[in-house]
Amino acid sequence: MAKLTVKDVDLKGKKVLVRVDFNVPLKDGVITNDNRITAALPTIKYIIEQGGRAILFSHLGRVKEEADKAGKSLAPVAADLAAKLGQDVVFPGVTRGAELEAAINALEDGQVLLVENTRYEDVDGKKESKNDPELGKYWASLGDGIFVNDAFGTAHRAHASNVGISANVEKAVAGFLLENEIAYIQEAVETPERPFVAILGGSKVSDKIGVIENLLEKADKVLIGGGMTYTFYKAQGIEIGNSLVEEDKLDVAKALLEKANGKLILPVDSKEANAFAGYTEVRDTEGEAVSEGFLGLDIGPKSIAKFDEALTGAKTVVWNGPMGVFENPDFQTGTIGVMDAIVKQPGVKSIIGGGDSAAAAINLGRADKFSWISTGGGASMELLEGKVLPGLAALTEK
């Protein structure tokens, strides 16, 4: 990577500002999935082991007005992080002001402080989300000229807590997580070991147009599953019953199929049901067509076999988006089948692009079989699309 990383700077005795991604799910104040906290530990531990004083910034959920602050405090995260680090985490519970400044100035080498949810600053004019220059400058002033960005999940956003701080420090560097995310995803797309197969699922073609276009140029094959299958089907005149379709994207789907030169591989059958919820009948279709009064909710057994064949011998696989409504056991067979087809390839570099695919791999017990699972759905999508991420662009060049 052509950007400075945390290993390129002297941290001893320095107040080091760190953007992490602690945007974790909370239920009644309890963290229900701590993966993002765990993912940030190597960078935090490195900073404190080097004698730095880690000052952490993160958002949590969306905060638009004062009432939204309830249930969006990072207090439970501070407690969880302290337990994981085996040391106290200072948590002043504010995003600015004398109390925060005093707590930061009282830090000793090897200590950790967590600033309150950066999006609390969005209540007054969206200062965080709109990258207010004064806020970025203020937060930068709390440190000693070093900023570590380890929040891949927000790298596609230009916020005060990443791009804003970067613009006001001497050195803005990548943390280990950000470095790994970029290395795995960018290298897979730009310099893959071939054959390179991309698998795209999810419900909407509109979410993935740019990704499909970019991957058709880079990959050897692009497999399509999930709800967007039916927009591609309808574009070819195939009956789709009551399946999800984006009528305004039929021309786009048709154009992608024409451009693909046979690289785009669609399912050849579906698992269909007579309703999305409260269905009384589930069955496999004979071929591509979905029956009248039914909707396709997963790829069928013939498609799983076809995708398995398409993946044979693959050396690089990037997967983004489930094959069906995997949260429902009746419609998770396709996602499981594709996951198993990926991970059984000898010597394959397998990457999951965050979001629902990551949730599927974790929930269905296959997370440890993949080379890399991205922590950022939106950011990984933009990398797959070939876009420049603002949070990455703002870092100091080597």
Curated annotation (Swiss-Prot):
Sample GO molecular function, one term: ATP binding
GO biological process entries: gluconeogenesis; glycolytic process
List of residues binding substrate: 21-23, 36, 59-62, 119, 157
Location(s) in or outside the cell: Cytoplasm
Coiled coil: none
GO cellular component terms attached to this protein's record: cytosol
Species for this entry: Streptococcus pneumoniae (strain 70585)
Keyword Secreted assigned: no
UniProt-annotated binding residues for ATP: 208, 296, 327, 354-357
Domain of life: Bacteria
Stored InterPro entries: Phosphoglycerate_kinase, Phosphoglycerate_kinase_CS, Phosphoglycerate_kinase_N, Phosphoglycerate_kinase_sf
Pfam families hit by this protein: PGK (PF00162)
Assigned EC number: 2.7.2.3
Pathway: Carbohydrate degradation; glycolysis; pyruvate from D-glyceraldehyde 3-phosphate: step 2/5
Catalytic activity: (2R)-3-phosphoglycerate + ATP = (2R)-3-phospho-glyceroyl phosphate + ADP
Protein name in the entry: Phosphoglycerate kinase
Root EC class: transferase
Keywords (A to Z) from UniProt: ATP-binding, Cytoplasm, Glycolysis, Kinase, Nucleotide-binding, Transferase
Gene that encodes it: pgk
